[in-house]
């Protein structure tokens, strides 16, 4: 912080868990033309069916080629007990987490009258590598998401620091995208790359 005062505010930024799973399905389950919000799910689930935005047949290159659908789901609340597994997500094993998320999804899809999500639809699933289940039973998230609280934009650092050869590229960097998103992180990365190139040409 002494070398670059803007870095002194990093510890005051708030972070939270918003990490998820991907379900690889035997069929393309198109629940909506865009993002999904499971409004009353205790774990505040959101999701999106991916293949509708991809080129045809791209899934044939995944794994053994049997998956025809991909449903990405984010868990936004890791502190509330679930409906079907009566524990918060951050206290669940990987298997508990799979069971709880699938049950919440199936319940919401069935209630909406849409095409049902069945257990037999699941080919495989993936939990973000940033979520670590330790041997003592604790769960750690190594990549918490910036929480965009009021006034936080002014405490966020620029991509180019005052420290030689230190550039920042992440969702917490100050950009024109005043919210933690992949787009904001991408913009920060472009700014960091441009700053690095500018320094290279300057020397």
Predicted stretch roles:
Residues 1-156, 162-187, 194, 200-201:
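C-terminal segments that line or cap access tunnels to active or ligand-binding sites in enzymes
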